Amino acid sequence: MPMIDLPHAVPGSPQALPDFDLILFGATGDLAMRKLLPGLYRRHVSGDMAAGARIIGVARTVLTREEFAAQAEQSCRRRVGEAFDASRWREFAARLSYLRVDAMAHADYEALATTLAPRASVVRVFFL
């Protein structure tokens, strides 16, 4: 896979950052809920994410996108505390999607590939 030359990012200037898809495996787990999603929310609030950035939660748990977003919101509210902003959360939540993927089910990986296919040119980050 070719390396991508990223522009120097200046904090708070999302125009310097490329659009990306973050595929977060284990999205319903403790690490994602306690650390990763609250940290990503903070990056969103500080303006450190490109407008087209997406966060695709992937896990074995059967959830709708709305249920996943509600769990993430509850966790972010706890972790961020008084700095939590409901209007900024709604913006951040619009970036979230969720796919149930069973590691042993080929069809589930095909569904993930289908989700990613329309944005083949963006940076993809797989967090396992």
What are these regions (language model features)?
Residues F126-L128:
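Periplasmic-binding protein-like
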Residues R79-V123:
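A structured beta-alpha segment of the ubiquitous adenosine-cofactor-binding alpha/beta core
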